Amino acid sequence: MKVSEKLLEQTGIIGEKIELGAFKYLSAAFVGSYIHAGNKIASLTGLSENFDKATEVSKNVSMQIAAMNPIALNEDGVSKEVIEKEIEIAKDQLRQEGKPEEMLENIAKGKMKKFFKENTLINQQYIKDSKQTVTDYINSEQQGLDITGFARVSLG
């Protein structure tokens, strides 16, 4: 069934016009999902393989995505523009704190490590166990497992 056909079908059921505001497609060996209470946030997680606990693991990672809203899977997924902007913000803050110019680059690199840890999915602290990263969690469930992609949609 096409998306347009499903929308038309649902319009007939609920009696109100439905408009599609966003559409995300994710292809992986296994794709799992999570819809947050209130149906305002939904997320998908692609895993590199299907295994016994794939549904549970992908739901937990999708919950992480809904809660923490990562901007990329890993450092390579963060655009050059975002990186440059964050470095400039860090340097400006350091200048305001009176740090010497020759130290700015090294301190900014440290701040970028923190930025990547907080904003890239595989490096984030796992919300159900802050002693682990998301990578640690998935590898504890299935050695060699990778997250191949993710998507997050929110209403409002």
Q: Can you name each region flagged by the protein language model?
A:
Residues 1-156:
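N-terminal assembly/interaction segments in proteins that build large macromolecular machines
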